[in-house]
Amino acid sequence: WSSDCALPIFAAGVPIDSVAHIEKMVPVRSDLFSPTPDYLLRVQGESMIDIGIFDGDLLAVRKSDHAKHGDIVVARLNGEVTVKRLDRSQKTLRLLAENIDFDPIVITPDAEFFIEGHAVGVIRTAL
């Protein structure tokens, strides 16, 4: 049995690096995910439903400023936080939804684009 760790929950769209934007802290078993996440992000929207990430879910995120092709990432694009699949397969960098109703997002050279972290799991709860 592993001990609990307390993780902050952030709402999508707020600065993830700001303590002022923490919804609340919740205990999470430290062996629930590997690697251990740094925070939970409350998902908003339906862009990732085809891989089982639904509106209101808590996405367990490991902080990282880089990710590899195919990773599910939390990215900041022009000030907006989004959860998408990173596509590095073409000459352009793209963020792909996992819902056919959403178009790919092409990252242009002038865009403010940062990887905030990558998904390590999902919690479906009423927290």
Regions found by a protein language model. Name each.
Residues 3-54, 81, 88, 92, ...:
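Short, positionally conserved secondary-structure boundary motifs
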Residues 48-52, 62-66, 110:
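Short, surface-exposed secondary-structure edge patches
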